[in-house]
């Protein structure tokens, strides 16, 4: 009898030990995958094979980020020194879009720049190493941007140009797209956005999708779309936006919106990264930002732009001053600490500086 009970005890012990190393099958089931690729139209660049597995597969890098044993899945309040799952390549200073194209992570915004001032500003930016230029129909400077790019001597494929359709163009988007192509005169448009929601925005976006198929536009996206608007809009279109461009700065941080957009495999870009609309001086003079800037031997503007990059937000500050344009490119020889990121996070006022 004792021999039988001893055998039973050994058997029970073996069963218990066999289950000790097993992890719950759904341990990571609820984790946000900010690099998860989305369903996308067929792309023409070979880089897409590395960034997405046939557009609906699982991104290998996302798998690596999401299966670390015991990893805390909650996004830190202020982000780490480089944001968790940051999609940016800080070596090449680019990000791979879900459309299969690479885009620079810093550039020049051209709002309020017109005529010769715009041409000179874009030229100064290109001479300073900038390869991302943002324009729009409503900026009335697409011709000037195109002129500067054409006359730069830089190969067209090395410069990434973004323009936008305004809501008053949504009723005839095909004509608006042709108008942008004619004004820029750059053979193709790297990215076209809808400037903000409006009547006919879905039809306008579908027209941009057709232009992608025709090779006139390479990537499409949205500007001034937030969570509620995206939840309504996305089910009605075929191509997931490659980018969403919103107002983002330390006083308006969109800490709930950014992770949502990134979780869809969409890149986030911030306009007015330095405040804008009369608020720039106030933001650059902020005591916390000034202290951090002094600690790194940098300007307040450089600290704010670096903060955006470490949050995974592409920056397009605007300027007509060649010195400031150059300064705004010098963002890659320092790094903010997690504590510094937290201090800037705490400056959030949820304060928009424009009506969009």
Region spans (language model):
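Short, acidic/polar
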Residues: 114-126, 170-184, 230
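Beta/alpha (TIM)-barrel catalytic core signal, keyed to glycine-rich beta->alpha loops juxtaposed to Asp/Glu
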Residues: 197-356
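CE4/NodB-like, metal-dependent polysaccharide N-deacetylase domain
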Residues: 174-194, 210-214
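Terminal-tail/helix-coil boundary detector
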Residues: 22-28, 52, 67, 72-78, ...
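Bacterial N-terminal signal peptides that target proteins for export
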Residues: 1-8
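Short, low-complexity, disordered segments immediately C-terminal to signal peptides
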Residues: 21-44
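N-terminal binding-site loop/beta-alpha segment at the start of enzyme catalytic domains
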Residues: 60, 74-159, 274-275
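C-terminal motif of bacterial Sec signal peptides marking the signal peptidase cleavage site
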Residues: 16-19
């Amino acid at each position: 009898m004792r021999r039988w009970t001893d055998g039973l005890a050994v058997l029970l012990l073996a069963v218990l030990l066999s289950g000790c190393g097993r992890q719950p099958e759904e341990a990571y089931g609820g984790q946000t995958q900010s690099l998860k690729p989305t369903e996308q139209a067929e792309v023409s660049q070979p880089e897409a094979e590395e960034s997405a597995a046939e557009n609906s597969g699982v991104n290998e890098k996302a798998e690596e980020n999401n299966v670390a044993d015991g990893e805390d899945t909650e996004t830190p309040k202020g982000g780490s020194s480089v944001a968790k799952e940051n999609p940016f390549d800080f070596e090449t200073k680019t990000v791979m879009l879900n459309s299969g194209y690479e885009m620079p992570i810093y550039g020049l915004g051209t709002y309020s720049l017109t005529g010769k001032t715009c041409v000179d500003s874009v030229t100064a930016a290109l001479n300073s190493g900038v390869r991302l230029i943002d324009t729009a129909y409503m900026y009335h400077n697409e011709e000037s941007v195109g002129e500067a790019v054409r006359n730069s001597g830089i190969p067209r494929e090395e410069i990434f140009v973004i323009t936008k359709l305004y809501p008053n163009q949504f009723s005839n988007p095909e004509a608006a797209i042709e108008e942008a192509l004619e004004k820029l005169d750059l053979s193709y448009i790297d990215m076209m956005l809808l400037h903000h929601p409006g009547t006919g925005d879905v039809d306008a976006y579908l027209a941009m999708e057709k232009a992608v198929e025709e090779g006139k536009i390479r990537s499409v996206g949205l500007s001034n779309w937030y969570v509620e608007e995206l939840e309504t809009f996305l089910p009605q279109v075929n191509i997931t936006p490659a980018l969403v461009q919103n107002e983002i700065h330390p006083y308006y941080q969109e800490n709930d919106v950014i992770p949502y957009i990134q979780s869809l495999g969409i890149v986030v870009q911030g306009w007015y990264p330095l405040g804008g609309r009369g608020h720039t001086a106030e933001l650059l003079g902020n005591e916390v930002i000034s202290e951090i800037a002094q600690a790194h031997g940098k300007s307040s503007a450089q600290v704010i732009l670096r903060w955006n990059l470490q949050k995974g937000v592409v920056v397009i500050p605007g300027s007509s001053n060649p010195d400031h344009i150059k300064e705004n490119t010098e963002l890659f020889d320092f790094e903010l600490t997690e504590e510094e990121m937290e201090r800037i996070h705490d400056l959030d006022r949820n304060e928009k500086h424009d009506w969009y």
